[in-house]
Amino acid sequence: MTPSNATVHPAINFYHDLVHTGALAQDTWDVLEPGMQERLLNFGGRPLCTVLRPMLQTEADYAWLGARTSLMLSVFRKTSNALMRDAGLRAQMALTPDEEALVRIPTGYDTNIPTARLDSFFLRHADGSRTLNFIEFNGESPASMGYSDVLAELFLETPLMRRFQERYNARPIMARPYAADALLRIYAQWKGNSSDKPRMAIVDWADVPTTPEFTILANYFRTRGMTVVICTPDELDFVGGKLYAKGEFVDFVYKRVLTTELLQRYGLDHPMIDALRAGAVCIANPFTCKLLHKKASFAFVSDERNAHLFTAEEQAAVQLHIPWTRTVAERNTLDKHGARIDLLPWASHQRESLVLKPNDEYGGKGVLIGWETDQRTWDSALEAAIEDPAIIQERAEIAYEDFPRLDARGSVEMGQRLVDCDPFLFDGDTMGGCLVRLSTVTLLNVTAGGGSVVPLFVIREK
């Protein structure tokens, strides 16, 4: 048996040895490639996974990640509650007037974050120590819970994983059961009873690259007793006090469409919003999730102005796991060492250690990597950010691992990848699985192109 403090590296080395054994690599790709096609594992028409190895974590790794994530969840839960109570604090999020109107509409249940995802870099060092840097809070019904589950099921069918499991127990952490439990819980609270099941509409634009995942999720939710229709925002109608999707009555919206895009298209005049105001529909994630989804939420939790909201343990966790972050503004503040700084001149001078992110974008849009940007472009972006809200964030230590793939000739190629390990969050207090993304470029985002998703397996030597 592997002791609980054993590192994951021997298991990774064993897997890589198997990759170079006989035809295991080609035989595995011959399962993965058609399997992804058959099981809707594509993103905008591209295969979801391009490598031969999943992410491996020891039991101790996963337990440690869960404990640290839970502590940060406490911080964000307190943040969300404080922002809902205090309009003065809420101003730090730079909500638009329409967003402010939406967050004031009662949801009918008690959490602002029924589902979410914390994006992070999780490093496991050879000496057994670990480093964890959270970099973004995805609060708007985050993608990949369905993708990652089905990809894990597919990997379990591959020759490589079968040989690997001769030495190691390997269990996936499935996110869909956690998601269904969370959605059923808020629906029961909204409805006032737990006997009825949601009549759900999964709502997003028709041309989004994650459309295949909607079918994956719909199929699973149906096994949990829900009725599900997939539709666009244009296919919703609010008539006679009831919401309809493609003509079918629904009382639950699983809102995958981003709030910003909905408001850009319709303003506040949309059937979903009308139904919410009338108490005729339960929506997840709620519009209140926007408070944490804003990039400014990371500035909020790391800003000395707000430290009084958190316990000493929580403040220490923020310092340890949240890179120093500030909303771009003409102000004095404290740097990560506690020294007082004039923010804008300091940010200009510290370009090579900072990233600039728009307050409300996704898929890497508008992100400037300071150490990959010339000074003139950087300074112009800082100046623009005074009017168009953005944050600056300290450069986080990035996780790298080698992953094998087949090249065009069918030969095994080992390549270093940047690794994003993003815990899925439920009910505002529970971690249930992770999205793991790989990239060869600094801007680690599948939406931006060139990335790969792999499933996570928690392992223990037999």
Regions found by a protein language model. Name each.
Residues 1-462:
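Preference for protein termini
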